[in-house]
Amino acid sequence: MRLIITRPEEDALPLKTKLESRGHSAILAPLLKIVPRLEASVPPLAYQFICTTSANALKFLQVESRLKAIPLLAVGPQSLLTAQENGFKFAEAHGGDVQGLAAHAAAKFVPQKGPVLYLSGAETSADLQALLMAAGFAVERIITYDAVIQRPDDIESAVKGADGVLLYSPRSARLWCDLIASSGLERRAAAPIYYCLSENVAKALPATWQKRVAKTPDEAAMLALLD
């Protein structure tokens, strides 16, 4: 199949390799550009655990050795892998989404034992900080990057003949719809199948478009949709 990848380039390139190894043709059409906040730093508090919902949140942080010994909860396998590559000794993945991660944290940790360090981008698809605070935790959120909107080159050529479009967040889905509308490609964009990481992603698309939703919100489940 001829598939359009809408993820930021840093995330899209490894995915392109995976798709091509499965016999697909992959076109990069990033809707967002990752811009690190190089000034981000972590206050020296006695955190009882760390949470992150994004691999990018860890990529651009200068991780001090004191943080690597603190338990880290990642939302999925990619953020877990990045945590392990950055030297976190007690990292584990739970939930697959923000709600599951918050529920696991509330079941495993006690708010009275110390604050939580939450590493994230400026915009998130769900409010993990609010969920943790509702469970009684004090949360120190550090934003380590911004995901800045960008317009892919030659979107008309990309959409023409595409069999599918991969969308990983509600924000990306909304940006895709805006791009299609501003380019006058509504009819052509209705032809491909839209492979969505979650129901929330699918809900951001027009009701008439063909959609397939991953059984779990991770890349393995997304790739399984293509089999």
Predicted regions and their residues:
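Signature of uroporphyrinogen-III synthase
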Residues: 1-227
